[in-house]
Amino acid sequence: MNIGLGAARKTILLVDADPHARATLRKALEASGFSVGEAATGEEGERTAHRIHPDAILTDLMMETIDAGGEIARRLAETGRQIPVYMVSTAADGLVGATGFAELGISGVFLKPVDPAIVIRTLKTRLGAG
């Protein structure tokens, strides 16, 4: 289920304080042909995004600060970079059914527990990597 031999590998940045959550998604993404970068905090995620120039970012909403994931999306949008940012959240985070994602620079939300197949399908569709 690789992205394709002739296509450039798309890079995904995973930002989550939970190393198990990152490892689970990383393994699934790499098995599907994506290159993966990781960060454990919002601040580290922002630095890593500037360093590796990912094609998309998956970030937990709630990390070391109240809204670390939303802050990453907002700051990247302020720089003018057009990187799809997807939140990984629980229904308790209050994002389900919320509106205004586009204004925050958020491309979508994946609910925990995350189904890697849905994430991969969404990323391949969005990034033209299918």
Q: Which residue ranges define each predicted feature?
A:
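Alpha4 helix (beta4-alpha4-beta5 surface) of REC/receiver domains from two-component response regulators
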Residues: 67-71, 78, 91-110, 117-122
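Non-catalytic signal-transmission and effector/linker regions of two-component phosphorelay proteins
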Residues: 1-11, 115-130
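Acidic, metal-coordinating helix/loop segments flanking the phosphotransfer/catalytic sites
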Residues: 38-56, 78
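Two-component/phosphorelay signaling modules centered on CheY-like receiver
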Residues: 19-37, 104
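Acidic di-acidic motifs
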Residues: 16-17, 112
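Active-site residues of response regulator receiver
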Residues: 60-61
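Acidic phosphotransfer microenvironment of two-component signaling modules
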Residues: 19, 40-44, 67, 117
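Alpha-helical interaction/dimerization surfaces of two-component signaling modules
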Residues: 27-31, 48, 100, 122
